[in-house]
Amino acid sequence: MTLPPLSHLDRLEAESIHILREVAAEFRAPVMLYSVGKDSSVLLHLLLKAFAPSRPPIPLLHIDTRWKFREMIAFRDRRAAETGVDLRVHINPDGVAQDVGPISHGAAVHTDIMKTQGLKQALEHGGFDAAIGGARRDEEKSRAKERVFSFRTARHRWDPKNQRPELWNLYNARTGPGESVRVFPLSNWTELDIWLYIYREKIPVVPLYFAAPRPVVERDGAWIMVDDARLPLRPGETPQLRSVRFRTLGCYPLTGAIDSDADTLEAVIAEMLVSTSSERQGRMIDHAPGASMEQKKLEGYF
């Protein structure tokens, strides 16, 4: 019997599903980080496929910084209700007590307290020994050298010089005392692969990825959306309606939009085919002094 050849997307899908099942089999208490972005949407779809028709044995964890786009939070809650997955939300109580935010405390402090420290708290409180994420190697140079099974110390730190070899599709899941693992099933996917798979599988994504007239101000070379009244306007700033969309999503004061008329999946894919810039160009935190992705990962960031 001759089987038809697998397409490029079929191979990526099969690899990711294999990794998800491997995590479920090898770890005591795995969890999947759900950031609500396009990669998380694909990962959730793969998780549902991997264990269908049963409910996935792996819960979802969202680290809420209190500054996500309102559409992201609404989409998160809607997808959790539609899929029936076990969604857990954690907000760093220390950050809430100090009222930490990107405006009052700056991008670096906000990201560290509300995201990095919040993530470490949630993993420790939940007793999770493996955290699945949607990071891809094509996103950023420090992620390009990370293993699929990325081992972290008891303090959640990543040591790029102390990782294990991965031969073919064989993964070493043995952890030492206090160690945990971050797992990246989408490591070998590209941004274009993600969008093509979303198109093929008809996966719902946050509407912010599609162009629409939105109120924005130009700040530090980026279009920042005025999502609510908490964003103070600087002298000379006046919100204007522009047709924009987002290639990446995070805390709204730290996420720049791009000018675009791509309001459909087909148009987004067509735009992707001719793009020459990084999808993370709109992440303001990546441009902050001393805030490289590798440094953040060394401190426990995903």
Swiss-Prot record:
What Pfam families does its record include?
PAPS_reduct
Please indicate if the UniProt record lists Nucleotide-binding as a keyword.
Answer: yes
**What SUPFAM superfamilies does UniProt report for this protein, alphabetically?**
Adenine nucleotide alpha hydrolases-like
Q: Which cysteines are joined by disulfide bonds?
A: none
Any GO MF annotation of the entry: sulfate adenylyltransferase (ATP) activity
- Matches recorded under NCBIfam families: CysD, PRK05253.1, PRK12563.1
Q: Which family does it belong to?
A: Belongs to the PAPS reductase family. CysD subfamily.
How the protein assembles, per its UniProt entry?
Heterodimer composed of CysD, the smaller subunit, and CysN.
The name of this protein is Sulfate adenylyltransferase subunit 2
Q: Which organism is this entry from?
A: Xanthomonas euvesicatoria pv. vesicatoria (strain 85-10) (Xanthomonas campestris pv. vesicatoria)
